[in-house]
A protein has these predicted regions:
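Active-site loop-to-helix "anion-binding N-cap" substructures in soluble metabolic enzymes
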Residues: 1-258
């Protein structure tokens, strides 16, 4: 697969970590060590309370700020929820949707799809997460399961909108466990994801859509994972909380052979 059709994205997912003051300190350090020149796209998806601080700190950089979730509704009596238009107004570019940790709390494919549609309508770039459990992998239904998640998550997404999306493969069995899919395992699934997109939207769009790997990628294994032809970046958890480790992954993504 010729990667010239696609952008590489290294996106951090902070989950429920860091306060606004810690965010300010992190961004200040990151700016001092962030490589200069033309590099891959970079994003940091941070807790909602940290978004304003992150946006202000990174305004003059190439780092896009994102949220970790949004509500499917534009407004209303949804205590504790945040709408997509609020995130956009706050300065967000990206939003993570369908993460396994959200699905574990009862979020359904239908819920995820509704969030994808509203995020696109409001001009955000959705990072749609899909992935299988260890049991599903061991019983041989990984491709079937992920195909179902993709079709459900993209239901109603028009051809002109799918181009603005990113898909992240996050094997649930590798999230926060220290286990990582081998480069070959990760590539096999990412290749199958691209095949699903090809069937749904055609070869041109399948060539253009970026697919990230999101299962415990770190500064030690990033190069081998990113060298795979259908892996176009990473959705980084723990390693994105340390500026030096995050930058090493960015540097791995920009090696001439990637």
């Amino acid at each position: 697969m010729n990667r010239k059709y696609r952008k590489t994205l290294i996106a951090g997912n902070w989950k429920m970590n860091k306060t606004p003051s810690e965010t300010k300190a992190f961004m200040s350090e990151l700016k001092t060590i962030l490589p200069k020149g033309r590099w891959c796209d970079i994003a940091l998806c941070v807790p909602a309370v940290c978004i304003p601080t992150a946006v202000r700190a990174m305004r003059e950089t190439r780092v896009g700020i994102g949220a970790e979730n949004c509500n499917a509704n534009a407004s209303g009596a949804y205590t504790g929820e945040i709408a997509a238009n609020m995130l956009l107004d706050a300065g967000c570019k990206y939003v993570i949707l369908g993460h396994s940790e959200r699905r574990a709390m009862g979020e359904t494919d239908k819920d995820v799809n509704a969030k994808v549609l509203t995020a696109l309508e409001n001009g955000l770039v959705p990072i749609l997460c899909v992935g299988e459990t260890l049991e599903q992998r061991e019983t041989g239904i990984t491709t079937e399961w992920i195909t179902m998640q993709i079709k459900a998550g993209l239901n109603g997404v028009a051809e002109d909108k799918i181009r603005k999306m990113i898909i992240a493969y996050e094997p649930i069995w590798a999230i926060g466990t220290g286990k990582t899919a081998t480069p070959e395992q990760a590539e096999e699934v990412c290749e199958s994801i691209r095949a699903v997109i090809r069937k749904m939207y055609g070869a041109k769009i399948a060539r253009a859509i970026s697919i990230l790997y999101g299962g415990s990628m770190n500064d030690k294994n990033a190069y081998d994972l990113l060298a795979q032809p259908d892996i176009d970046g990473g959705l980084i958890g723990g390693a994105s909380l340390v500026p030096e480790k995050f930058v090493k992954i960015i540097e791995a993504a920009n090696q001439p052979t990637i």
